[in-house]
Amino acid sequence: MEKMRGKRIRPRDSGELVEDGRSESERKTRKKENDVVSKGRIGRGRGRGEVSKRSIEIDISNPEKDIKPDGSRKCLGSTCHHCKILTSESDLIFCSKCNKKCYCFDCIKRSYSERTHEEVRAACPFCMMTCICRACLRLPLVIKPPSEKDTDVKLKQLQYLLVKVLPVLKDIYTEQNRELEIESTIRGHPVTEANIKRCKLDPSERIYCDLCRTSIANFHRSCPNKNCSVDICLSCCKELSEGFHQERDGKKNAEGKGYECRIPAGQGKDSDAYVPLHFSTWKLNSDSSIPCPPKECGGCGTSTLELRRLWKRDWVEKLITNAEKCTLNFRPTDVDIVHECSSCSTNSDSIRRQAAFRKNAHDNFLYSPNAVDLAEDDIAHFQFHWMKAEPVIVRNVLEKTSGLSWEPMVMWRACREMDPKRKGTEEETTKVKALDCLDWCEVEINLHQFFEGYLEGRMHKNGWPEMLKLKDWPPSDLFEKRLPRHNAEFIAALPFFDYTDPKSGILNLATRFPEGSLKPDLGPKTYIAYGFHEELNRGDSVTKLHCDISDAVNVLTHTAKVEIPPVKYQNIKVHQKKYAEAMLQKQQYSGQVKEASELENKSMKEVDESKKDLKDKAANEEQSNNSSRPSGSGEAEKVIISKEDNPTQPAVSTSVESIQEQKLDAPKETDGNTNERSKAVHGGAVWDIFRREDVPKLIQFLKRHEHEFRHFNNEPLESVIHPIHDQTMFLSDSQKKQLKEEFDIEPWTFEQHLGEAVFIPAGCPHQVRNRQSCIKVALDFVAPESVEECLRLTQEFRRLPKDHSSSEDKLELKKIALYAASSAIREVKGLMQSSRRSDT
């Protein structure tokens, strides 16, 4: 999706092509590109091997030797479908299914090594839809539509959706009625929606609040001046009328109490420069109307903002009335979400996985079915856990697909073939941007080097593992266009299709935007990154702690285990020990920044004396505050870490010895019944997902210890706006243990294996660490069970500073709820009418 600039957005023409700058002669004489596939002896994930170009020499100097005794001409050979090279028939395997395609031994060995010659002869890769030759990668892949649902089942699902969406519709209606009352006071007479001027937008346009960047769904206040186009959402209007903005600004938004509102200055709406808006100069008029912001803040400063609507009058009220009528006789299934799932406890060995060790808890085990065994009625089982906002892990989802290769270079070649801006350059010169997890800085690297490191590993000059994450490749809004076959393969792998189908999922609210309207970018999106089997505690390949505004499903499609030679491994251990010692020294002074800065100007003797005093002081405070810590006081405590201090307290375990014991030993197999989850092996990535109800305590812990986290250039965090939404913190194993000791909360922790789909509920903070090089593909969706949580998160995100990476309302939840209700009501009415006709 095009980056938003200003307040109203029009998408680029989807068919627009950009000239690549080459002349016609250059296009005709472009050198044929090599058919390259990455080395596959290490990678896992549907396709391995490398393709090499072969040529076959055919002697045509003596044409008579090609004539058979009976006078017929010998067949010189056939063309391999994959490499398109003329090959002797003795080196080819012909498909007995289609009787058309054939593959040479070399291509089978290098590109389809997971299949035997007999399997290829029975059904070739082309027939199996797994061929990765250039021609096949360009072919459009038709996705088989899901079977038509039973009318009664579909009706109940739509009614279920309406029941879940109704509370959001009522919130929108209440908010609009409140603004109508204010407008009545301003005008001095009763005002209805018929009296409110309608602002019509093109279906491909969006309108955003100029204060909080929230998408405007219907009612808003707008400047009537033709030369000014300031728009403000109802939430900001409410806060302005209550004096909220005059009291709150600056860093107070880090605590969720307000935000420093910013609007464009200088060049007007299209300016990238934002200045703080001081509300002391922007006050309500005496009649409670809101004046347009002053010129220095992007407005005209002369007009009064007028109430506007985007839709037909009384549309929201009619939606509520119709939704209530459609669900009048609907009775949702009674679900006991307080106790443990009876289905999981009955089939404990096959469909659940232990992910936490909380005492007296019913949610330590996660629902983890096998995709191959899923039946249609399992959707109710999924709903039970989704209502409780519990993650779900579905195993073996790739078994439902055709088996198309997810090798990184196969994906790259497919992406290149579909690129309209393709210039014909060789892959060795193709540059991409990646993030170095050591300092979180952007680096430029060519694709071959990146993917070689993906398979074989990369090291910094000092021997420390280099962990890179490919940044936005292919672009998230182009995944379906650039990788159509991989997109179809991913969609086919998704379980619980009613929720996850991005086009027509009946319980995916995000699918119900009107045709031609500008839809939010919900993926699919690829995440390609290196990994290391142990936690390094420095420069790990991680996705830092964050919270998604919508539900999401993440599928691990490919892994590659990098083998580290013993000599290099020992070198890593040496560097780990040195780093742990250095960190230990720094942490001994990090309890109070003020005291530490004063110590910097003292002599070494004074430093040593002060160091001892600080240790004693911290030890006394720790002993006296042990009982009060779980209460979650907002004051930061002095935490001094040392191997000699308080050895019986396991909350702090960052000494050199403990780090060596926990992180440097080779991982061992675990049966999952002991609290050694970080030592489990063979998984591609380790997930930590926190419960929604634990978020307040988690935030308190992060604020208390924010000085212990590092981000850019591996330096301590300079400022924290929001400890979760900033996405700058990652909890190590020792910090998770400390969190458990101080606040008695722990995440669900589990490993994601190849072919597993992880479902993450909206509002659950989570973090991920790669244990191997991984390719993951993720998709966002909006489930009926999560719609109220999504709305709450929207309100939380809008309080962030305007230049914050999470402040933009990318989901447009209110629009989604309105469109979903409108669409579902139409379908329910149609089904009910059809049912009446059939009865008569």
Curated annotation (Swiss-Prot):
The consequence of residue 548 to A is: Impaired H3K9me1/2 demethylase activity
Result of knocking out the encoding gene: Higher accumulation of histone H3 methylation H3K9me1 and H3K9me2 marks, including hypermethylation of histones (H3) at CO and FLC promoters during flowering and at PR1 and WRKY25 promoters upon pathogenic interaction. Early flowering probably due to misregulation of CO and FLC. Higher water loss leading to an increased sensitivity to drought and associated with reduced abscisic acid- (ABA), hydrogen peroxide- (H(2)O(2)) and calcium- (Ca(2+)) induced stomatal closure. Impaired resistance to the virulent bacterial pathogen Pseudomonas syringae pv.
Q: Cellular location of this protein? A: Nucleus; Cytoplasm
Q: Which residues bind Zn(2+) 1?
A: 80, 83, 104, 107
Stored Pfam families: JmjC
The zinc fingers classed as RING-type run over 80-127
A GO CC annotation given for this chain: nucleus
Classification via PROSITE patterns: JMJC
Q: Which cofactor does it need?
A: Fe(2+)
Cofactor binding summary note = Binds 1 Fe(2+) ion per subunit.
* Superkingdom of origin organism: Eukaryota
Q: Which InterPro entries match?
A: JHDM2-like, JmjC_dom
Q: Where is this region: Disordered?
A: 1-52, 594-678
Residues forming the JmjC domain are 502-798
Tissue-wise, where is it found?
Answer: Expressed in seedlings, inflorescences, flowers and siliques, and, at low levels, in roots, leaves (including vascular bundles) and stems. Particularly observed in stomatal guard cells.
Listed binding positions for Fe cation are 546, 548, 766
**Biased composition, Polar residues: where in the chain?**
621-631, 647-659
Give an example GO biological process. Answer: response to water deprivation
Instruction: State the conditions that upregulate or repress this gene.
Output: Negatively regulated by RPN1A via proteasome-mediated protein degradation in non-drought conditions. Accumulates in response to drought. Induced by the virulent bacterial pathogen Pseudomonas syringae pv. tomato DC3000 (Pst DC3000).
Q: What subunit structure does UniProt give?
A: Interacts with RPN1A.
According to its UniProt entry, the function of this protein is described as: Histone demethylase that demethylates 'Lys-9' (H3K9me) of histone H3 with a specific activity for H3K9me1 and H3K9me2. No activity on H3K4, H3K27, H3K36, H3R2 and H4R3 methyl marks, but weak activity on H3K9me3. Involved in regulation of gene expression. Regulates flowering time by repressing the major flowering regulator CONSTANS (CO) and promoting FLOWERING LOCUS C (FLC). Exhibits a positive impact on abscisic acid- (ABA), hydrogen peroxide- (H(2)O(2)) and calcium- (Ca(2+)) induced stomatal closure.
> What is this protein identified as?
Lysine-specific demethylase JMJ27
